Amino acid sequence: MSLGYGGTLIKHLEDDTSIIYSYSSYNLNDEKYRNADRIFDGTITVNKSCFVEPEIHEKLRKMPSGRKKLVVKRIPQGVDISEMMKSGKLVIENSNNMWDCLNGIDRIALHLCYILFNDYQKNGSYPDMCSYHV
């Protein structure tokens, strides 16, 4: 069963140093914040230096056929979003559909940032879109 809130993030602009994403958030439990038109009015600007490379583990494994195979695992690293915001490398402009905030920042935007950094570490490329639905 769903709690009825979430958000979506879409990449708009990318240059050599930064990426600008726009996001929308919604809360189906409150008529004022439903955002039925899915208007992307919040922005998240991320400096590319914020994207941390994952820790890579390589291991030789013996396969059932008897051959050995190199297995590569990408282990995501923790990202300090609050430190990035303090240094100005991560800038969040809240959506008009913000109903819950943490220190003046939309909670959905923070969840989307976490998913954004995690997707980068898993795939190795800057995500074009990500979403968070609870």
Predicted regions span which residues?
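Short N-terminal edge-element motif at the start of the domain
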Residues: 1-29, 37
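Short linear sequence elements within intrinsically disordered, low-complexity coil regions
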Residues: 10, 26-28, 45, 122-125, ...
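A structural detector for beta-sheet-dominated domains
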Residues: 10-12, 24, 45-49, 73, ...
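A short, surface-exposed beta-strand/turn
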Residues: 30-63
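Acidic, low-complexity intrinsically disordered segments
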Residues: 50-134
